[in-house]
Design a protein with these regions (language model features):
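Alpha-helical scaffold segments
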Residues: 1-178
Length: 178
């Protein structure tokens, strides 16, 4: 824990408190993730993920790793860069004992690859859309500026709420003017 915090330049966390209290540790991990994601270099990411994943409470470590995945996905230049970055982390992620935690992170990576491919110009099919989580469908319904993607979500979204968000956004004057 001390090395992880020092490597991120975080010196105001009591290491003994962090070791003893999962809430303090979780907060420290969030700060480490913020520093790590804001760095231009991705060279230390795998080691940082490995250190976080050694936490005795997998839910705490999984949450921190998912936060890093989310932040990096929003920084990369496209799906190829994210695919390469995430592939480097998968051996560490696959060390998680709980299969549900491993699967959750793998699904999140898949979701972001789907999102980034759309941002890169790919128009998904209903079958491809069905393979992403409700969470990602909602992100797309709320953020996509593509009328074609919104129409797909309106027709094939997995939940009524997703379909309604997409339908309402597709009909907004602001979006149609773009």
């Amino acid at each position: 824990m001390a090395d992880l915090l020092a490597g991120a330049g975080i010196f105001d966390v009591d290491v003994d408190d962090a070791v003893a209290d999962e809430h303090v540790r979780s907060s420290a991990y969030r700060r480490v993730v913020l520093v790590t994601a804001s760095s231009r270099s991705r060279g230390r990411d795998r080691a940082i993920v490995a250190a976080i994943l050694r936490d005795p409470i997998e839910m705490v470590s999984k949450s921190a790793v998912v936060a890093l995945v989310d932040r990096i996905a929003m920084k990369v230049t496209g799906p190829a860069e994210f695919r390469q970055w995430s592939a480097e982390l998968l051996p560490e992620i696959d060390q998680l004992k709980a299969e549900r935690h491993r699967e959750f992170i793998h699904r999140r990576v898949h979701d972001w690859l789907f999102y980034l491919s759309i941002e890169d110009g790919h128009m998904p099919t209903p079958v491809e859309l069905a393979k992403v989580t409700d969470w990602m469908q909602r992100v797309l319904a709320e953020e996509s500026t593509s009328l074609a993607v919104l129409a797909l979500l309106d027709e094939s979204g997995s939940r009524k709420k997703i379909r309604n968000i997409a339908k309402n956004r597709a009909g907004s004057r602001k979006l149609r003017a773009q």
